[in-house]
Amino acid sequence: MSLLHGVGDFFALDIGTNSIRMIQLSGNAEKGWTLDKFAYVPVDQKITKDDSETGKRKLGEIILGAREQAGIKTKNIAIGLPARKTYTAIIEVPNAPQRELTQTVKYEADQYVPMSVDEAKIDFAVLGISPNDAKKAEILLSSTDNAYAESVMESVEQLGLNVIAQEPEPIAMVRALAPVGVQDARMIIDLGETSTDLVVMYQGSPRLVRSIPGGLLSFVRTVENSLKVRDDQARQFILKFGLAQDKLEGKVFEALRWR
């Protein structure tokens, strides 16, 4: 199993705070992708945060129900790993053939991975020659706690599915949203319910990957308190009007402006 790569016929699963999403595509990176299957199911966050066997069973039933709803037949699955559970960095190592790079990265990883290398699942991708030193290669290094990765895989495989890949959500976001061939600097942001992932792109590759606490829920609370409205109303205002200054007399914009 690879942390970064999925191959063959498969579908992808993303378990969020209050929903699950799954998608199956056809095609390839060169010719383009086509959406084949898709499912979105709201989930009580008490279930997604419940690590008990009962909670896992309920979540598993929802996942299988969503798969059936989407009409997905393949059992091969790629799972998104939350950014807060992964560590991603760009490092530079002496340029060398792939086999030697593998050994070098394993050695160098100990300096970057915020856990014991023996307790981590580590994968990497070669981005190319370093713009700072032609004798070095730029490496996208990604890691997660091995016990966590194995726990997630075990829970999913108990549903009769075959995990072929686990990928950090920020990296999946880059592959899905980053424009192909764009070389200038771009920032891609994913505003989640309780945290926000951001990736800075340059010359077609991620250069900075971060997950920061605070997400949509923080905005909802701010608007709720400022406009004296219910939680569901505040959420609707934000999703419908955003930061538009000409909507709702600019009240949502003003509430979030100085947050």
Residue ranges and their predicted role:
Residues 1-108, 150-152, 160, 184:
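Non-catalytic, solvent-exposed interaction/assembly segments
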Residues 13-20, 82-84, 188-196, 201-205, ...:
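A short acidic Gly-Thr/Ser loop motif
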Residues 36, 207-209:
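A structural motif specific to WD40 beta-propellers
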Residues 234-259:
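Adenine-nucleotide phosphate-binding core of ATP-dependent small-molecule kinases
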Residues 76-179:
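Active-site neighborhood for divalent-cation/phosphate handling
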Residues 101, 229-237:
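Small-residue helix-packing motif on alpha-helices
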